Amino acid sequence: MKDKNSGSCLILEKVSHSYGAVSVLNDLNLVVHSGEVVVMVGPSGCGKTTLLNLLSGYIQPVSGSIRKEGVIRTVYQQDGLFPWLTVGENIAIGLRSLKDATLQEKERVELINLIHLEGFEHHYPHQLSGGMRQRVELARVLAGESDILLMDEPFSALDYQTRLRMRSELARLLEQRPRTVVFVTHDIEEAAQLADRVLVLSNRPATICRELHIPSRRPRHLTDPAVIDAMKEILKELGLPT
């Protein structure tokens, strides 16, 4: 009999976590399949970042189990670029698992072209705009043998127009280099545009109170009926006006 979770990258079973006497996650079950983009939304402080930290292995659950298949990389709100390294050198950090120097250089050039930063490979992070820095960060986590991306509000520090561009950029990159993604955001638009599945978390201690499967293929425009319908459903679940 075939395992019902065959092809799954992440499996959480009855996961609970607390900080001292404060319960943050309660008996949470979740399966994330290979190649799926799962976006989590919920009230501020409900435990979304804690869940990412559990998935990354940075912290361990108080109870329950987490099974992970593949190499995990994390993207945070603030990029993790090394200021003393150039664009090319920062991307090369993600390629250290490739032992062949020729293959490593070929991959580095391909990634620079993929994020449309040709001619910027010798620039330092302080010489780039916020959006350009996040594109370098995306290239770095897509480099080499990464399988799972954990993304904690990666575009929230950017202005609205740049956020829109970065959503399109991420969708384009995932088309060309598919990965399993777990993405945390407070942005309802972002969730509806990027996700295959949206998880709405409850107030703390968080449980999954609603799952929304978005049928239209990525990438999606903001005017896509599936995006608009998903936004309405998310807002309704969060108790916000539509």
Whereabouts are the PLM-identified features?
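A short, proline-enriched helix->beta-strand linker immediately N-terminal to the Walker B motif
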Residues: A143-D147
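ABC-type ATPase nucleotide-binding domains, specifically the catalytic core motifs of the NBD
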Residues: Q60-P61, E89-E105, L114
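The feature captures the beta-strand-to-loop junction immediately N-terminal to the Walker
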Residues: V41-P43
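Conserved ABC ATPase signature
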Residues: Y124-L128, M132
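Helix-to-loop junction immediately C-terminal to a conserved catalytic motif
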Residues: S56
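Conserved ABC ATPase "signature" region
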Residues: T102-F120, R172
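Hydrophobic anchor residue at the start of the ABC signature
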Residues: L138
